[in-house]
């Protein structure tokens, strides 16, 4: 008897309830599995392949329906699956559940994943538990299908007092937990899953992208409209700008190249070498150059900058710095916290007792007075000899050597990002720093001084420093198609290794041979190099940086200590002020930027520092000072100082290798764009997730949201196979739909609500207020006292123009002011009628793009909101009523603008029956309210004379009832009102 009842309760094929759908899907799966077990798959491989494909499809269907049942029964008791955030995007597919079930059955049967034998052995017990639990759930669900199924029910109707229902509930909970554990284990074994650190780094990358976008919007590189419209160009612009911002602006963020490589995000880890080179060059750009580069990365426009090559500070120098370098330096020094404690520029005006101070004073005076004396130094034969000492100097002539000026950093973003690589040099005219009086120094004392300061430790440190430089800078760049990014950062005529290493290496072998020529080879850069090195040592304040850890140590510290004895407090307070002004972090090399003039950093080599130092040393003080230096030498501290100075020289030297600023910016553009565009290929899924989050966070909030009820969960996988009759029924009135499509352009429709309209229509109109456009309405022969609704059912249709007027405000203001000239309007009636006719002819031909006349048309460029749209429409109608000549002989006619259509993307369901739209269930717009309905809810048709639609068009059922039932009564009332208005 029970079997007979079960047979009677078996779900029908057309039953759309969840239990019925599960019943038929499970039966199909069982049939395929039985057929697959009935023959030898090795004998018939083609048939086996087809059946396996059908098996996996049926498994997907069964698990999808089971998932819907668990959603309804378990609800919040389901096992969390937050781990899916660590999965690659391509793994999260619709058939993931079927793949997991198939893999669990294979593992339970004894097979193993290829090249994953260890993981397969560990997962096998879990896979067996999953298959067993799923089999139990299938049996219980089949039993419920035969006992408690309600045909075509959208919800489950289970007997809560039945023990099998409670058993089903517990079985579903166990299966859900086991299946979630197996999903994490199986996917982790098959693909690379992000660790916790990698996932957090990806989130930080998203924060960087968002901050970059907000910064680009703030400085005008991008527009908010592009973000709101999801402009595809932003998919390329944002990653490019993020690289620049992450390396320069937010230097301590996720693109901090100083952190270990394993802590860097996996997205940028392959590009670490090239990013370091890009960072070093970016830090030498000023504000103007950085803005030009970012604009180039956004728009791909030509570089439009004429900044000379010498401008290499992160902040653009002010005109005062360029025109008056000495004056600006003195002002910067005097405006500090202690006016009497400054660098050697201000020291020359207060201290002149010692020989060192006299030498510095002569150098500064010579720089101030000899801006145009470059011809002498360019013809000096000793300059050529000094230039040949380093290959890095071959590309520059003394006439092109700019002097450095202090470039204070007003913006905290660049001051944080700036390091010693941003050794400043501005566009000041070159100065001749040579002084004939200094050539009287004794060369023999210099040679003896050099030989006494050499040591074996210095040789070892020099070799190690050279190895570190070669290892850091000679690494190959990350490849893009047909391009080496590492080589792109080098000039075409200079090899990669010559950029940073050649000057030090070649100088090592040539300095001893030219030791006696140190005082004779003075040029602008060498004298400036002495001051730069001396000030650098003063600012760093190393306790024992007396000895230079190079192969040819110099007496820079001797000069420094000689200057420090009378002004030790001055230097200390100056160094403190420098750190407070620029907010530098713990790196020592950060404390000597943007404060004092440096020579051309390309020429500030070891030999240059040696020669310049010896110029300022009094011969009588060399021997005691040198003994004091040797007594307090610290090799490690001096080595750290040498690394910092070398880093600054290397970075600025790399910039000076390029022919022009345009060439440098172009190289940076190619490299940055190459790295950013490769992210689109190598990390497409991660980049899509980041950009999606960035767009959602930074898009402007919608002005008005359409209230559409949420869809029910049980109908997410609703299967609907439309028959021929269904298709015909749902597309009923196809001719009307074609007519509607020809008659109305939804993009140009306006939200319009007449004063006498009902509230329901106004609500539908307000739902599409965001689609409002500037429409103009022509009203002819309108009575002065007639209401806007009094002409809605007139027989004649006035012309409706949809135009984007450029003078909407002027037309609206003139229409408002026309009330004061009513009598003049009456006298000029004939002239106005002629203007109306001409305006209509132009609108019929090409459309009106000019401001409409106040007497004929009125624009609707009000605020984009439903309230202002409706109130503005009333004002426009009233203004037009006042401007028209009252006449009892003419009939009233007014045509309203059709309502805006709700976009298809904002209406996933029918607004009447809430049925989701599918490939067969089409969307239809009601011409009266603009709503989106299915074919069943919008199969009515009626003419809409108030919109100028005399033919029957598609309307929804609610609008059809209102229009048909109230049409005659409203028309009669309107006629009475029109007669009364004309009589008055």
Curated annotation (Swiss-Prot):
A zinc finger (FYVE-type) spans 904-964. InterPro entries: FYVE_LST2, LST-2, Znf_FYVE, Znf_FYVE-rel, Znf_FYVE_PHD, Znf_RING/FYVE/PHD. Zn(2+) 1 binds at residues 910, 913, 934, 937. Residues 760-779, 789-806 have a biased composition (Polar residues). It comes from the Eukaryota. The modification Phosphoserine is found at residues 544-545, 805. Residues 434-462 have a biased composition (Acidic residues). Keywords: Metal-binding, Phosphoprotein, Zinc, Zinc-finger. Zn(2+) 2 binds at residues 926, 929, 956, 959. Residues 571-611 have a biased composition (Basic residues). Pfam families: FYVE. One of its GO terms (molecular function) is zinc ion binding. Residues 326-356, 369-380, 387-404, 412-433, 630-642, 811-869, 886-899 have a biased composition (Low complexity). Residues 308-462, 508-527, 539-642, 749-900 are annotated as: Disordered. One of its GO terms (cellular component) is early endosome membrane. Negative regulator of epidermal growth factor receptor (EGFR) signaling. Belongs to the lst-2 family. This is Lateral signaling target protein 2 homolog. It comes from Drosophila yakuba (Fruit fly).
């Amino acid at each position: 008897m029970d079997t007979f009842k079960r047979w009677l309760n078996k779900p029908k094929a057309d039953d759309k309830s969840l239990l019925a759908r599960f019943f038929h899907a499970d039966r199909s799966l069982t049939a395929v599995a039985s057929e697959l077990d009935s023959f030898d798959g090795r004998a018939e491989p083609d048939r086996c392949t087809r059946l396996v494909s059908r098996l996996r499809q049926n498994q997907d269907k069964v698990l999808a329906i089971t998932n819907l049942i668990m959603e309804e029964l378990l609800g919040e008791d389901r096992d969390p699956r937050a781990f899916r955030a660590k999965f690659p995007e391509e793994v999260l597919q619709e058939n993931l559940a079927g793949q997991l079930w198939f893999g669990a059955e294979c593992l339970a049967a004894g097979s193993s994943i290829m090249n994953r034998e260890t993981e397969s052995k560990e997962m096998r017990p879990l896979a067996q538990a999953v298959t067993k639990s799923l089999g139990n759930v299938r049996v219980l669900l089949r039993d419920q299908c035969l006992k408690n199924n309600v045909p075509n029910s959208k919800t489950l109707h289970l007997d809560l007092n039945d023990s099998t229902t409670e058993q089903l509930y517990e079985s579903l909970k166990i299966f859900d937990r086991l299946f979630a554990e197996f999903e994490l284990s199986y996917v982790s074994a098959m693909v690379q899953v992000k660790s916790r650190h990698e996932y957090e780094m990806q989130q930080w990358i998203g924060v960087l992208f968002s901050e970059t976008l907000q910064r680009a919007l703030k400085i005008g590189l991008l527009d908010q409209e592009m973000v709101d419209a999801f402009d595809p160009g932003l998919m390329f612009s944002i990653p490019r700008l993020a690289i620049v911002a992450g390396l320069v602006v937010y230097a301590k963020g996720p693109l901090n190249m100083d952190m270990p490589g394993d802590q860097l995000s996996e997205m940028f880890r392959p590009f670490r070498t090239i990013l370091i080179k890009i960072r070093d060059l970016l830090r030498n750009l000023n504000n103007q150059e950085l803005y030009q580069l970012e604009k180039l990365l956004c728009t791909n426009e030509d570089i439009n900058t004429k900044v000379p090559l010498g401008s290499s500070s992160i902040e653009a120098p002010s005109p005062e710095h360029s025109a008056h370098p000495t004056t600006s330096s003195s002002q910067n020094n005097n405006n500090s916290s202690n006016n009497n404690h400054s660098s050697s520029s201000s020291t020359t005006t207060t201290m002149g007792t010692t020989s060192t101070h006299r030498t510095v004073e002569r150098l500064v005076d010579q720089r101030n007075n000899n801006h145009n004396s470059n011809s002498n130094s360019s013809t000096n034969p000793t300059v050529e000899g000094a230039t040949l000492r380093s290959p890095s100097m071959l590309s520059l002539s003394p006439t092109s050597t700019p002097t450095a000026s202090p470039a204070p950093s007003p913006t905290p973003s660049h001051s944080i990002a700036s390091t010693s690589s941003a050794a400043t040099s501005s566009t000041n005219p070159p100065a001749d720093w040579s002084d004939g009086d200094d050539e009287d120094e004794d060369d023999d004392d210099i040679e003896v001084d050099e030989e006494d300061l050499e040591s074996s430790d210095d040789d070892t440190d020099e070799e190690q420093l050279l190895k570190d430089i070669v290892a850091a800078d000679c690494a190959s760049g990350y490849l893009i198609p047909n391009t080496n990014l590492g080589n792109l950062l080098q000039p075409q005529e200079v090899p990669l290794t010559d950029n940073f290493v050649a000057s030090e290496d070649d100088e090592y072998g040539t300095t001893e041979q030219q030791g006696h020529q140190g005082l004779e080879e003075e040029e602008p850069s060498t004298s400036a190099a002495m001051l730069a090195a001396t000030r650098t040592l003063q600012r760093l304040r190393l306790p024992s940086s007396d000895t230079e850890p190079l192969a040819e140590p110099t007496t820079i510290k001797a000069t420094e200590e000689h200057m420090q004895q009378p002004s030790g407090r001055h230097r200390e307070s100056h160094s403190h002020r420098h750190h407070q002004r620029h907010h530098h972090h713990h790196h020592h090399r950060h404390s000597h930027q943007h404060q004092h003039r440096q020579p051309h950093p390309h020429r500030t080599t070891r030999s240059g520092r040696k020669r310049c130092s010896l110029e300022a040393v009094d011969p009588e003080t060399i021997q005691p000072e040198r003994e004091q230096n040797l007594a307090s030498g610290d090799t490690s501290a001096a080595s750290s100082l040498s690394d910092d100075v070398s880093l600054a020289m290397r970075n600025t030297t790399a910039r000076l290798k390029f022919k022009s600023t345009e060439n440098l910016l172009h190289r940076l553009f190619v490299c940055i764009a190459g790295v950013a565009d490769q992210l689109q290929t190598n990390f497409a899924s991660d980049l899509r997730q980041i950009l999606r989050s960035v767009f959602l966070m930074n898009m402007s909030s919608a002005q008005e949201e359409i209230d559409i009820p949420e869809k029910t969960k049980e109908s997410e996988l609703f299967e609907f196979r439309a028959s021929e009759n269904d298709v015909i029924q749902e597309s009923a009135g196809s001719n009307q739909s074609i007519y509607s499509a020809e008659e109305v352009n939804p993009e140009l429709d306006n939200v319009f609500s007449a004063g006498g309209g009902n509230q329901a229509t106004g609500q539908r109109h307000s739902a599409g207020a965001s689609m409002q456009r500037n429409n103009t309405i022509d009203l002819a022969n309108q009575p002065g006292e007639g209401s806007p609704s009094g002409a809605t059912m007139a027989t004649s249709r006035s012309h409706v123009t949809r135009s984007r007027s450029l003078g909407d405000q002027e037309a609206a203001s003139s229409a408002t002011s026309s009330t004061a000239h009513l009598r003049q309007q009456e006298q000029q009636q004939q002239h106005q009628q002629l203007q109306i006719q001409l305006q209509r002819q132009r609108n019929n031909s090409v459309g009106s793009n000019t401001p409409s006349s106040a007497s004929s048309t009125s624009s609707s460029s009000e605020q984009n909101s439903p309230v202002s749209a409706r109130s503005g429409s009333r004002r426009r109608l009233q203004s037009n009523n006042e401007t028209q000549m009252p006449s009892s002989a003419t009939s009233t006619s007014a045509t309203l603008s059709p309502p805006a259509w709700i976009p298809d993307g904002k209406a996933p369901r029918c607004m009447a029956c809430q049925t989701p739209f599918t490939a067969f269930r089409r969307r239809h717009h009601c011409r009266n309210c603009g709503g989106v309905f299915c074919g069943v809810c919008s199969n009515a048709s009626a003419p809409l004379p108030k919109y100028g639609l005399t033919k029957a068009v598609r309307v929804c059922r609610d609008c059809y009832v209102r229009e048909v039932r109230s049409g005659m009564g409203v028309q009669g009332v309107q006629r009475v009102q029109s007669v009364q208005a004309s009589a008055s």
